[in-house]
Amino acid sequence: MPDISQRGQEMPASPIRKLVPLANAAKERGVKVYHLNIGQPDIPTPQVGLDALKHIDRKTLEYSPSEGLLSLRRKLRDYYRRFNIDVEVDDIIVTTGGSEAVLFAFMATLDPGDEIIVPEPAYANYMAFAISAGAKIVPVRSSIETGFALPEIEEFEKLITPRTKGILICNPNNPTGYLYTQKEMNLLRDLVKKHDLFLYSDEVYREFCYTGAPYISAFHLEGIEEQVVLIDSVSKRYSECGIRVGALITKHKELKKNVIKFCQARLSPPLLGQIVAEASIDAPADYMLMTYNEYVERRKFLVDGLNRIPGCYSPIPMGAFYTVVSLPVDDADRFCQWCLSDFEYEGQTVFMAPASGFYTTPGLGKNEVRVAYVIEKEELGKALEVLRKALDAGIPTVLLDRDIAGLDVGRVMLDNERAG
C-alpha cells in the first residue's frame, strides 16, 4: 500500500472537532450534549442575510471573480472604515472563510523552513496551515496567571532568527478571549518594524470587545502599513460560519499579486456566500447591539459560574466568546473524552475542547480546556452543573488505563461509518 505524506502525518487533529465521534455516540445513547467546544454562535443570522439567500434569482450560479465580487469588496471597505481601518477596495481579497485567508497568507509569504512567532495558546488551525506551507510555528508562552497577556517583548526577541518571517496574533484572541492593549500593540509594531517582519493579525472578533477601550487594529499602527496582513471573516459577527466567506487585506502590492495567484488556482470564493455576506453588512445596529449584549451577559454568567466550582479558574476574557479554564484534573484530554464516553448526569453531559491542542509546546495546557459561551444562559447553567458533577465524580480508576484517545475514538468512528 502506498505511504501517505509526511505532511499528512504531521497534520494535528483538531482539539475542537476530534471528539465529535464520541459526542455523536453519546447523542445516539440519548444523552443531551452541551456544546462548549466550538465557536458556532447560536445567535440568529441577520434577517437581511437570510432574505438575500431566499431571494436569489439567477439562472446560472457562475464563478465569481477570483478576488471576490466587486460589490462585496466595496461594502467591506466601507465596513472597515467604520472602525477607522483605512483600506481601499484593491487591498481586499475575498476568501473562502478566514481559514483560507490564513492559508493563502502563509503560502504567499513563507518558504519551507521559515518561522512565524505566535503567542500560545493559539487557534489550533494555525499549526495546520503552517504545516501546509512547510513553515514552522515558534511559540512564545502566555499564561493563565496573567490572563494570557502578551508575553514580554524580550521573549519574542530571543526567538527571532534569520528564518523568522513574521509574528501572528489573534485580537481579540481565540482561544483565550484576551484583548491586546494599545501599549502591547505598539510594542509589536516596534518589533516588526525593527526586524522587517510581517504582522499577521486575525481580527475576526473585533465586534466583541468588552473593555470599553477603543478597538485597536494592526492597521491602526503607523509605520508598518505594508507589513500588516489582516485576516477577517463574517462567520462570527453575523452567525454565518456555514457560508465560508472571509477576507485577506494587505497594502503590500507584491503580496497581493501573489495571493491572487492562489485565489485563481482555487477559481472562486463561494458565490452564494458572498451574496449573503454582502447583504449582512447592512444588518441594523440594533442587531449588532443585541448580539454584543448577549455575549456580555453570557460571559459574566459563565466566568462567575466556573470560578465558583472548587479548583476551577477562569480569567475574565475581554473579547471574543471564549475562555480558557484550568480544571482540577491531571489530564484535561482524558477528562473531556470521559465526559462524552462514560459520564452523564441526569441524561446530560458536556463537550469541551482540551486546551493542550491550542499549544505547540508539549505538556502545556494539560489541565486546561477552552470553553465557548455560544449557548443560551439557561443551557450554560445546566452545563456548569454537569461539569461540577463530573469533577466531583472523577474518572474511575478502572478507566484510567484505557486508551480513550486512540481506541475509543477510533472504534466509535468505525461504528459510525458502518452505521452509514
Task: Identify the role of each PLM range.
Residues 2-4, 8, 12-14, 19, ...:
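PLP-dependent class I/II
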Residues 36, 59-62, 75-78, 82:
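Glycine-rich loop-to-alpha-helix module at the N-terminal edge of alpha/beta enzyme cores
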Residues 66-68:
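Short beta-strand to alpha-helix junction loop
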Residues 70, 74, 289, 293, ...:
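Generic detection of well-ordered alpha-helical segments
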Residues 390-419:
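Flexible loop/hinge segments that line or gate small-molecule binding clefts
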